[in-house]
Amino acid sequence: NMLGEREPEIYGSDTLHDHVKEAKRVTNKFGYELRHYQSNNEGDLVDQIQNAREKHIGIIINPGALTPYGWSLHDALAASEGVIIEMHLSNPNQREPWRHTSVVAPVANGSIVGFGIQGYELSIRALHQIIEDDDK
């Protein structure tokens, strides 16, 4: 949340609505249905991940400030089925040292970082490619 308002020099001027709209455009190209969820509450995110376990083919997650210490996200994602892509608008490795370690990365198929709003398209394309490769 607060995208487009908070630190636009880092996160850009696109709003959360803009990001979701772009992600839906890309998922529609591949014939997928996007289910978007945003919360500042880690427990709510865990609930969503656990509820999606057998209903979704993949999860693209931007853990934000939970990246270095969201161990409950790590555990929920580890128990998930399907593809997991970690995505960040900025590149955490170019920022403060406390942002450099991700507890999500070890359970993700891959990470897309530093591409702003384009990161969602890249993440969806990566998710699609992994699914296609698994179907071969």
Give the residues covered by each predicted segment.
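Glycine-rich phosphate/diphosphate-binding loop of Rossmann-like nucleotide-binding domains
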Residues: 1-30
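Short glycine-rich anion-binding loops that position phosphate/pyrophosphate groups of nucleotides
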Residues: 1-2, 64-67, 90-92
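Short, structured coil segments at secondary-structure junctions
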Residues: 30, 80, 107-108
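Short beta->alpha junction loops
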Residues: 33-43
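Short, glycine-/small-residue-rich phosphate/pyrophosphate-handling segment
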Residues: 35-36, 85, 94-136
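Short acidic active-site motifs
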Residues: 44-48
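Short acidic/histidine-rich motifs immediately flanking catalytic phosphotransfer sites
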Residues: 52-59
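Short Gly/Thr/Asp-enriched flexible loops that form oxyanion-binding sites at enzyme active sites
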Residues: 70-81
